[in-house]
Amino acid sequence: VTKIISFYSFKSIGCTTAIAFIAKHLANKGKKVAVIDFNLESPNISNLLSLETFQYKGVVDYFYERALSLSHQCSTTINDICYRCNLSQNISVIPTGDIDKYYIHRASELDRGLIASFYKKDFNPIRALINDVKKLIKPDVILIDTNSGINDLSSIAINDLSDVVYINLFPNEIHFKGLTIILEAIKRSKFNNKRKQPVINFILLPLPHMRKKKLLKKVEQWIQKNNIKDFSNIYAVDYNYEIVLSGIDIDESIYTDYKIIANSI
């Protein structure tokens, strides 16, 4: 059974980097990994994972055509938007698409209600995409990079698609306030969708090493204060300038914190 895992942050922080390193480690262990970029506003996973080719089509094209078509048969298929990663043949990437004037228009249209409308129709392009990925790639795991903030596509990825969710945060009041709302929405969705609530994990990053214990304590206090019970683990990722400067193509010994997370999947 393919496990579906989403990475989310209320403020844009660290999701794409986490996915890239986790995908790399899982692939090195022999797992087949599919990475889907739902971060329509600031897509970057295709750059970080160094795709072999890029033919200018992606998630936005797949959704947009199916939103407007009266038929399920569209010119853009899963074969057109799935690309191999240079780092490993075990990693397949479904990017958002080429960032041109057409992309901006289509992404804006999707953001203005088309995504939500998929759930009012018999045919749902989002679920169709996931099923197509499963059939074509047969991955052990699907990793989804989501938009930050509160939006339809991230909500769908978390509440309707995912078995596990990793929530990236930095322990300050902005994140705490936003995540309190998000966690309540996840809890309510468990009843609305009649499906099992996803397993919630927190990733704290990027943490200055000298302040790690203090910041972890702050998160634990927030969890206790808000009576947050439905979560599994808290992971802490140290700030590492080598990751910032070098990207993903670095020695495994440098990204140990991400390997710990990957090994839990």
Show which residues each predicted segment covers.
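Conserved beta-strand segments of the P-loop GTPase G domain that flank and frequently precede/overlap
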Residues: 7-8, 36, 95, 143-144, ...
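P-loop/Walker-type NTP enzyme "switch/lid" segment
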Residues: 40-134, 245-247
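Switch II (G3) loop of P-loop NTPases
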Residues: 117-122, 126-157
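Well-ordered beta-strand positions
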Residues: 141, 163-164, 233-235
